[in-house]
């Protein structure tokens, strides 16, 4: 007769922990899949662009967001944005400010990094490259999908933070420095996590990667 070996208390606890971890991982996977169920993911390699050197690919939890940059509108701001993209500075950076159906904001390189998020200071961080001047002289229509650099309440304080609007905002013209526009994948941004009672998000979604189509 084979003698049954009774599991110790610690072994039972470990077993229960493993089961709970598996259930949590399984449910989290399907929660993400469900959130993104009807969002089309665009493959930039299957799209022909007129100006491929000015195409940026923002990868977020629900897929790719393809942005066309406008150096003719704001040359210094676009150059700063490209510089940070090429250094992979935006990877794993939080969408720290999200207003439902209005805008998403990211780019706090100092206090918005995954694994080192500082809730007390997020939104105030810098890139280390210094501020650049506002570029608002060229007429620009801030329609849905427009991308602009964020700033403080003062002009000429743009740095690394940027926002993308999810609806038309005509009053933003001459107020913010535009750098481009989303041409594919805006729906993926509408799935970025937000809170109903606050612009600032606890346990936020993150930028997975942000790359230029052509380096």
Predicted regions and their residues:
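Cyclophilin-like peptidyl-prolyl cis-trans isomerases
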Residues: 1-215
């Amino acid at each position: 007769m084979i003698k049954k070996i009774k599991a110790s208390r610690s072994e039972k606890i470990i077993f229960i922990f493993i089961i709970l971890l598996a259930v949590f991982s399984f449910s989290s996977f399907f929660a993400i899949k469900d959130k993104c169920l009807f969002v089309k993911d665009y493959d930039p390699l299957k799209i022909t662009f007129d100006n491929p050197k000015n195409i940026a690919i923002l990868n977020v939890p629900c897929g790719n967001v393809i942005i066309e940059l406008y150096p003719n509108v704001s040359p210094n701001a676009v150059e700063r944005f490209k510089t940070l993209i090429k250094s992979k500075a935006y990877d794993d950076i939080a969408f720290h400010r999200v207003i439902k159906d209005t805008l998403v904001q990211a780019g706090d390189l100092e206090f918005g990094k995954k694994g080192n998020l500082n809730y007390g200071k997020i939104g105030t961080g810098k890139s280390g490259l210094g501020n650049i001047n506002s570029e608002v002289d060229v007429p620009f229509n801030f329609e849905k999908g427009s991308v602009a650099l964020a700033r403080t309440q003062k002009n000429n304080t743009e740095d690394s933070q940027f926002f993308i609007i999810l609806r038309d905002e005509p009053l933003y013209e001459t107020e913010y420095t535009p750098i481009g526009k989303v041409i594919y994948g805006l729906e993926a941004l509408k799935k970025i996590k937000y809170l109903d009672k606050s612009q600032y998000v606890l346990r936020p979604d993150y930028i997975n990667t942000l790359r230029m189509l052509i380096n």
